Amino acid sequence: MSRIVNVKLSLKRYEYEKPFHITGSVSSESRNVEVEIVLESGVKGYGEASPSFRVNGERVEALLAIENAVREMITGIDVRNYARIFEITDRLFGFPSLKAAVQFATLDALSQELGTQVCYLLGGKRDEIETDKTVGIDTVENRVKEAKKIFEEGFRVIKIKVGENLKEDIEAVEEIAKVTRGAKYIVDANMGYTQKEAVEFARAVYQKGIDIAVYEQPVRREDIEGLKFVRFHSPFPVAADESARTKFDVMRLVKEEAVDYVNIKLMKSGISDALAIVEIAESSGLKLMIGCMGESSLGINQSVHFALGTGAFEFHDLDSHLMLKEEVFRGKFIQDGPRMRVKDQ
């Protein structure tokens, strides 16, 4: 009764509450692919892919075009053999977000068959996590207003997007710190700086007495030497995001001693590689945060359960659904301000 009898993909569009601006990109909507896995028992498991051309080279149209191929890959397999399904979907090399969605939908269906939740299948290490909330690139004045609003909403970790104007970025962080005292800051350049600019930014902020908890992806993804340079010349811990898409990327980063943190995103790695990265981190002393692309509440649900289950993360950047207009909340978790916890069955 636990065998897969059908797999369906469908396009979903979500409008942002306001345009979301990061280095080199402004988004007004998120176009995602919803995955539905149907079992012979009638149980349905759900996942969501939020493809990024900028990070993964994925297009929504390409994901939808391989619906039949994905269906053929896993139809007839019992979801209790989820490791087998993971192994098969690892072959979706060019479609990491779809791989993540199919793998989670498999676990979602299995958890329903077993009368439990995905976070418990993954270990059940934590009952609650706390997310940050993001300030996109804007004028200094607007960034400060947004950060103050986020702080007043109860968020104590604030993510600040930078990378397009060094002088304004330094000023924005300084002014944000004045109105959000007691908050922790994750600063994300999204590959926007050169090595020299990245170090200049970090030192300027440090000299103003501002502490940054995580300095994320300051340089280009392929510039591993640059990440290492910034790490050893910056007063703040450096994280890889775009440079860390697969477990093999992370192994190289560890070998090169290039970063202090890696930002796991299921949309980059799928569940299978994400689990491997957790093991690599635990073995090497690498610290972890977990992030997102443009997922709705259905997609963020995947990362929330992964984080609750593994308990592997120091920081949680799971706020994309808070920026989108959704008619119905579809996460199997309770959102209480920044806190996210398991929803009772």
From Swiss-Prot:
Pathway: Cell wall degradation; peptidoglycan degradation. Its EC number is 5.1.1.20. The keyword ATP-binding does not apply. The keyword Ligase does not apply. GO terms for biological process: cell wall macromolecule catabolic process; cell wall organization; peptide metabolic process. Its cofactor is Mg(2+). It comes from the Bacteria. Pfam families: MR_MLE_C, MR_MLE_N. Keywords: Cell wall biogenesis/degradation, Isomerase, Magnesium, Metal-binding. Substrate binds at residues 134, 159, 190, 292, 317, 319. Binds 1 Mg(2+) ion per subunit. SMART domains: MR_MLE (SM00922). InterPro entries: Dipeptide_epimerase, Enolase-like_C_sf, Enolase-like_N, Enolase_C-like, Mandelate_racemase_C, Mandelate_racemase_N_dom, MR_MLE-like. Mg(2+) binds at residues 188, 216, 241. GO terms for molecular function: L-Ala-D/L-Glu epimerase activity; metal ion binding; racemase and epimerase activity; racemase and epimerase activity, acting on amino acids and derivatives. It catalyses: L-alanyl-L-glutamate = L-alanyl-D-glutamate. The active site is at residues 161, 265. Belongs to the mandelate racemase/muconate lactonizing enzyme family. Catalyzes the epimerization of L-Ala-D-Glu to L-Ala-L-Glu and has probably a role in the metabolism of the murein peptide, of which L-Ala-D-Glu is a component. Is also able to catalyze the reverse reaction and the epimerization of a broad range of other dipeptides; is most efficient with L-Ala-D/L-Phe, L-Ala-D/L-Tyr, and L-Ala-D/L-His. NCBIfam families: A_G_epim_Thtga (NF041118). This is L-Ala-D/L-Glu epimerase. It comes from Thermotoga maritima (strain ATCC 43589 / DSM 3109 / JCM 10099 / NBRC 100826 / MSB8). The lineage of its organism: Bacteria, Thermotogati, Thermotogota, Thermotogae, Thermotogales.
